[in-house]
Amino acid sequence: MIPNGYLIFEDESFLDSTVAKMNALRKNGQFCDVRLQVCGHELMAHRAVLACCSPYLFEIFNSDLEPHGISHVKFEDLDPEAVEILLNYAYTAQLKADKELVKEVYSAAKRLKMDRVKQICGDYLLSKMDSQSAISYRNFASCMGDGRLLGKIDSYIQEHLLEVSEQEDFLKLPRLKLEVMLEDNLTLPSNGKLYSKVIGWVQRSLWENGEPLERLMEEVQTLYYSADHKLLDGSLLDGQAEVFGTEDDHIQFVQKKPPRENVHRQLSTSSSGSLSPGSTKHPCKQEWKYIASEKTTNNTYLCLAVLNGMLCVIFLHGRSSPQASPSATPCLTKSLSFEGQPLEEEPDKLLSPMHYARSGLGIASLNDQLIAAGGYNREECLRTVECYNIKTNSWTFIAPMRTPRARFQMAVLMGQLYVMGGSNGHSDELSCGETYNPNADEWTQVPELRTNRCNAGVCSLNNKLYVVGGSDPCGQKGLKNCDVFDPISKAWTNCAPLNIRRHQAAVCELDGFMYVIGGAESWNCLNSVERYNPENNTWTLIASMNIARRGAGVAVYEGKLFVVGGFDGSHALRCVEMYDPVRNEWRMLGSMNSPRSNAGAAVLNDVIYAIGGFDGNDFLNSVEAYNPKTEEWSTCADAFTDS
């Protein structure tokens, strides 16, 4: 067909033929310009091909000081056969791996940020999983930090706990043995509330008493379950018992507020995802989670849970006489007889994740809903926008932005959303902006900034939009610039510059002042905070945060600032701080369940939400929420229905 006089021809065999020839060139070492050294094995390839398939290698090649020479990339913790399989995939789009190598291919794909391959390998493992391999697969998924894979494996274990508990891997797990003494005519409840109290007791023992988890497992621990459904420490039954939970506690397992001296210990925990295939020592994240439970015989219960990042069996045995001293606790053996009673309560309903993983996104609360816009999901810069309905615990799409953008912030001004600057994934910085009208469900352009701005803070104050700081054109250092947009005159003006250059700072309004929190001057993270007074157009340095951070989220609740997560120069952070402007001081709060840098934070219905971000390994679509009244973070939706 020749429309308009032009010849158009499509060779359907060209692509297959070309990639086959390119792969042959690779195997013969012809025209190769990159050498991969994997545990003593040398693999040759073409830089352009690998850069298209691996964002990790793209970043390395893009920063190569000698772009026209041969690149050398060294891996000491990957399987050479797995990397060769990924190279074949990069050239042929065909993934062929023996079942014994799938975990190694997954690990290599994770390191190279080949997310599609990682997902395919994960799905394959799920298809082969049975009761015998479930624990092994869960350990692997946990150490890889794959929330999607973990969720599916945990669902399988919940449905097949009886069969799983009879397998060797399960029987080798660390075991916490609890003797729970009961008042007369009481039985232990077969539901999650009991295990919530138990996990709370373990956390308290570790964090307040400094008791190592291993020591708690050395001997039987005695607790007391009273008639009013309180779980008490059995060693304190002489009238000084401490209550560890009540019947109306939420069924949730969250990281409790640690003592001040433990904060720095938590921050130093590595969340690296670099794993050596076949290694048994993987750096797993700290986690507290109830997975599954079953009632066995004679008031005995079995629970699988994660305690401080360790997969454990909690074995509970109830005795009817509180005064009796337990002489023994039944041991879990392969011959245990189960009654097979179902759980009396359904598993906790989690906060629904976004449709897309997003880091460097814009977050705002508008019309009793949370709005998440743009961001990176590793593969691309997004322009999609999602809306969270707290009543239905669901995310739906609204009109997408006109321009893909990430590394920006979003603000609400006069009932509309505003986004300014950022990056579109191709150009480092944007000067354009948009505003969203919720009534029309559409985005329209607003006058551009005078200069391109990426990683700038955005805030509404006195019916005007402020854009503060950001990166210079080279992205190497922060800016002091502060620009103001008037939505009535649609004009930009300048205001006083910051005292300190900042990019990736958290920005918000509180009580008629604008706060600019943390960020980085160049690559050095800041803990300093500045406050802007629009009455006299001045910036004042106020009390500094406890932890220097950039890429943190910030939210305002009841006259205080809450700063969540961020990056300290080495690690994505879990820690949270609160600023009291009356006292001009910062206080550490309970940490989030996941580390999050470049996440969004917003308040809805008296609850602070942390959304998306990057945990040091993966881009996140997950959501967790903080109840300021209880000072606890949770991923459980039901925990906030009455908030």
Curated annotation (Swiss-Prot):
The name this protein goes by in its record: Influenza virus NS1A-binding protein homolog A
Species for this entry: Danio rerio
PANTHER family reported in the protein's UniProt record: INFLUENZA VIRUS NS1A-BINDING PROTEIN, KELCH PROTEIN
Kelch repeats: from-to residues: 369-415, 416-463, 465-512, 513-559, 560-606, 608-643
Domain BACK positions: 134-185
GO molecular function terms attached to this record: ubiquitin-like ligase-substrate adaptor activity
Physiological role: Plays a role in cell division and in the dynamic organization of the actin skeleton as a stabilizer of actin filaments by association with F-actin through Kelch repeats.
Low complexity bias spans: 267-280
One Pfam family recorded for the sequence: BACK
Residue stretches making up the BTB domain: 32-99
Cellular localisation: Cytoplasm; Cytoplasm, Cytoskeleton; Nucleus
Any GO BP: proteasome-mediated ubiquitin-dependent protein catabolic process
